Amino acid sequence: MMTASVAGNRSGRSGNIARERSNRSRGAQKSDKERNLSKGSSRPKSNSSRVKKMRKSSLSKVQKNFAVFNDSAEHENKYETLAVAEADEKEVILLDEEEDTAMTTETKGVHAEETANVTGAEGVNAAANALDDNQDFIGFSDSEEEVASGEENGDADYAVEDAEDESSEPLPTNADYPWIQNHDHSRQREIADWLTLEIKDFVSYISPNKTEIQLRNDALKRIRDAVQDFWPDANLHCFGSYATDLYLPGSDIDCVVNSKSGDKDNKNALYSLASYLKRNGLATQVSVIAKARVPIIKFVEPASQIHIDLSFERTNGVEAAKIIRGWLHDTPGLRELVLIVKQFLHARRLNDVHIGGLGGFSIICLAYSFLKLHPRIICRDIEPLQNLGVLLIDFFELYGKNFGYDDVGIAVSEGDASYINKKEYPELTRNLRGTFNLVIQDPGDPANNISRGSFNIRDIKKAFAGAFELLTNRCFELDAATFKHRVGKSILGNVIKYRGAKRDFKDERALIVNKAIQENEEFHQRRGRIVHRDTAEFINISDDDDYELQPPPKRARVPAPAPAPADNVVVLDDPADDYVPAQPVDKLMGLDDTDDYLPAPASPTDTPKLDKAAKRNYWLSKGQTM
């Protein structure tokens, strides 16, 4: 019995041990699974976290908050009844600016109920059909090979693109350089040609139209009539930029009042005329400058809003206008170059002589001497109108970098220009500050320096040098750029800015007469008919006087006096046939005279006489020397 019980106890213990081992192995396996699960997933262990119980009050509060979304009366979908528009089913997608064709994809509107019935298998089949139909295309830009082939066949592409540009819509106006609107020259292969065409466009853009010329003519007529009403013996003449067609939009008009008495340049006359113009509504913003070297009246004509400068008893400006018109007629490219330089200085406020800037006449003389002395123009190597870009860069380089302002001056005449040594003309450098200044000899007065008021010449020189740098850098930059990056760019815009009102490209100077030029020509024609009684006195001939050329007086014939008769000659009024002279002809001719001519004998030559002793001593001395 005991043995059986002991055996039973042993078997029970062994069973317990086996069960403990199996439990341990199961626990180890379970712990390994939990470790692997914790490594592979970020979910927390189920045994490690305790479930947090929520209070009943909090649960009811949450239920009330979510109950709001179950109320269909307050929250109804307003877009349930809207139908999908058929026009929106197709959508155009532009892949790239350089692509010739755009890819069109069809996007169908599908309701939510229909999408719920679509299974994953149908989506896979739709993708497979798209691949089979080649509808999965994605557009990219041109490859390198296509770009290379495009560059090789560039001429044909440029022609097609130019045709497209001509038929395209107008380009938007650029506020800084509006003269390039619808005038794109970026297709020019030579940068110099591009700049030349742009200069011509700018000149055409700022040239006056018919309305502007008529506005100035009317304003000038009103002022002239007022001056003649106030002073019957006076007349108004125009000079400066308006009398030479070299004025910018909005520039002033320079006028001069000349009278027969010549006494209208005093202080009393200036204030009297200014008051008269203001009372009659012909002048606003009146300013009388009576203490200046050249007294003037500055005012604004109210009808045209044009600024007018009125001087008195001077004719040099009218004479200069005639000379400048002759230069413009004989020098191609002068007008274009002058207008560019004027606008360049105007934008930098360097064109006002009262603050040391460069005046209009000085600018014209600089441009005229530059063109007359340019070596390639002298040799007829280039045509000025076809090389305005190169000439503009050369102009800025000459007067901004190379011109010797300390030693060199400029002399201009009616048909020629030259450089002069400033030291040889002390009258031109009198009362100037230092040696670094600009000297331009007046073509009408050789002792006058027309640029003596331009004391700010250092800033002007720096501006010219900067313009040269800007233009050359811009030319190199655009020359290296592709044609795509040239579109809409401007070379001249680097140095020229126009901030005025929008204009058109109508140069209508040939359609209407400029009254200032016409009256200036008539003035010189009348001056040519003046009879000079004295160097300082002239006879003024008006337009109403009839001028007739008198034939020169015939010279009276004066009879020559009769020669006096000789003493031995008797003059008979009616000689007879038996006339015998007082002396025979043979005696008069000396035929009977004897030949008593005895020539004087030739005098013998005086030869020096030496004695024998002297000769002997001479030859002895010669022998000793030998």
Swiss-Prot record:
Renumbered residue ranges of the record's region Disordered: 1-62, 590-626
GO biological process terms held by the UniProt record: cell division; polyadenylation-dependent ncRNA catabolic process; RNA 3'-end processing
Cystine connections: none
Alphabetical list of Gene3D superfamilies matching this protein: 1.10.1410.10, Beta Polymerase, domain 2
Composition-biased stretches (Basic and acidic residues): 18-37
Catalytic activities: RNA(n) + ATP = RNA(n)-3'-adenine ribonucleotide + diphosphate
Annotated keywords: ATP-binding, Cell cycle, Cell division, Magnesium, Manganese, Metal-binding, Mitosis, Nucleotide-binding, Nucleotidyltransferase, Nucleus, Transferase
SUPFAM superfamilies: Nucleotidyltransferase, PAP/OAS1 substrate-binding domain
Domain PAP-associated, residue spans: 387-448
Residue spans of biased composition, Low complexity class: 38-49
Entry GO terms, CC: nucleolus; TRAMP complex
Binding site for Mg(2+): D252, D254
Binding site for ATP: G317, K342, N448, R452
InterPro entries, A to Z: MTPAP-like_central, NT_sf, PAP_assoc, Trf4-like
Biased composition (Polar residues): 1-14
Any GO molecular function: metal ion binding
Short name of any one Pfam family annotated for the protein: PAP_assoc
Family: Belongs to the DNA polymerase type-B-like family.
Quaternary data: Component of the TRAMP5 complex.
The protein's role, per its UniProt record: Catalytic subunit of the TRAMP5 complex which has a poly(A) RNA polymerase activity and is involved in a post-transcriptional quality control mechanism limiting inappropriate expression of genetic information. Polyadenylation is required for the degradative activity of the exosome on several of its nuclear RNA substrates like cryptic transcripts generated by RNA polymerase II and III, or hypomethylated pre-tRNAi-Met. Polyadenylates RNA processing and degradation intermediates of snRNAs, snoRNAs and mRNAs that accumulate in strains lacking a functional exosome.
Protein known as: Poly(A) RNA polymerase protein 1
Gene: TRF5
